[in-house]
A protein has these predicted regions:
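Periodic small-residue-enriched repeat registers in elongated scaffold domains
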Residues: 1-164
């Protein structure tokens, strides 16, 4: 779907769906499917095992719920969620939210990001910070003494806010 508020859906095995207009949505429900939404405030969802979802517009959201799925959100204030077992979720936009499931990995390259902590999960925070010095912070569920579902906001590698579920 290429117009504003359009939607696209693929339900077969290895299908793909793409929505490029503002507020568009794309969904792929078959195993190994992919979904992409590139417009402002778009959403993409892949629910099959090893599926991938990507949202590139500002405020977009991407979700992959199958095992070993991946989700990516590259716009500011976007969110990425890969809740299946061993999934990966990546955000690059400032003030975004990232979440992965058990034994998964969540990654962000934004200076300020919120991680939704899950047991066994790892969060990798690559940030630039002041004076353009690139740094890396690796946080674990256990190491942060998090509660399942707790929203932990990092700014330049430091925890600045914690919100219990």
């Amino acid at each position: 779907a290429t117009r504003a508020s359009g939607s696209a859906s693929a339900t077969g095995e290895r299908g793909s769906a793409s929505a490029t207009g503002g507020s568009g949505s794309a969904s792929a429900t078959g195993g190994s499917g992919s979904a992409s939404a590139t417009g402002w405030s778009g959403s993409a969802s892949a629910t099959g095992g090893r599926g991938s979802a990507s949202a590139t517009g500002w405020g977009g959201s991407a979700s992959a719920t199958g095992g070993s799925g991946s989700a990516s959100a590259t716009g500011g204030s976007g969110s990425a969620s890969a809740t299946g077992w061993r999934g990966a979720a990546i955000t690059t936009g400032e003030y975004s939210t990232v979440e992965c499931g058990k034994d998964g990995i969540a990654v962000s390259t934004a200076d300020e990001v919120t991680w939704i902590a899950r047991p066994g999960a790892v969060f990798v925070h690559r940030y630039e910070g002041i004076r353009s010095t690139r740094s890396l912070k690796i946080a674990t569920f256990k190491g942060t003494k998090a509660t399942d579902g707790e929203r932990i906001t990092f700014k330049c590698g430091k925890i600045v806010k914690r919100v219990m579920p």
